[in-house]
């Protein structure tokens, strides 16, 4: 939450500075009982007096079909009005058939949540296997740290200074 507030409180020198906020993993939870919730940046920017500073993006590209999902943009009215001016001449229209496919398949937010539970059932064992190996092989050695995410699709690993090239080389050997 503190990081979101710090972004919202930025006072950039350039009047057209914008934050492009990719909220890609908002619904990608691995566990029903442990779900990270990020503070909502649009309202925080508005509270901080910078309602036009952020464009927030989301899509179903990691929910349904990569490259064939549907996407959305959230921002201030002024930003959206400005964006509509250029979007009107950049595209002949949205893929309404694909939008209809998504609506018919999911029906509502509960359908999306149930679908994401299926994703979690596939992803959770993979995350847990990687975390188990990291802990068994590297835990307690003080040579690296890693995240234990509650969602998303990545585990971040931080190694000791100067080890990245050797780690990448070892990964290529595997």
Question: Which residues fall in each region the model found?
Answer:
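Short beta-strand segments
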Residues: 20-23, 58, 72-74, 147-148, ...
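Active-site pre-lysine segment of PLP-dependent enzymes
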Residues: 1-66
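Alpha-helical scaffold elements within enzyme catalytic domains, especially in hydrolases
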Residues: 9-10, 122, 133, 170
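Hydrophobic alpha-helical bundle segments that form small-molecule/ligand-binding pockets
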Residues: 137-143
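Conserved C-terminal alpha-helix-loop-beta "cap" of PLP-dependent enzymes
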Residues: 80, 84, 154-174
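Conserved glycine-rich beta-strand-loop-beta hairpin in the small C-terminal domain of fold type I
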Residues: 116-131, 143-158
């Amino acid at each position: 939450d503190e990081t979101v507030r710090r972004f919202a409180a930025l006072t950039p020198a350039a009047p057209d500075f914008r934050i492009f906020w990719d909220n890609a993993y908002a619904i990608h939870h691995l566990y029903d009982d442990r779900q990270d919730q990020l503070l909502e940046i649009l309202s925080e920017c508005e509270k901080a007096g910078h309602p036009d500073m952020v464009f927030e993006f989301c899509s179903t590209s990691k929910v349904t079909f990569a490259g064939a999902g549907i996407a959305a943009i959230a921002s201030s009215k002024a930003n959206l009005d400005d964006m509509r001016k250029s979007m009107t001449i950049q595209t002949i229209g949205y893929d309404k058939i694909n939008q209809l496919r998504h609506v018919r398949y999911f029906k509502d937010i509960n359908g999306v949540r149930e679908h994401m539970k299926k994703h979690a059932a596939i992803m959770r064992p993979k995350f847990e296997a990687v975390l188990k190996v990291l802990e068994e092989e590297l835990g307690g050695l003080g040579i690296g740290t890693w995240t234990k995410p509650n969602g998303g699709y990545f585990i971040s690993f931080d190694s000791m200074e100067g080890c990245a090239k050797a780690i990448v080389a070892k990964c290529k050997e595997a």
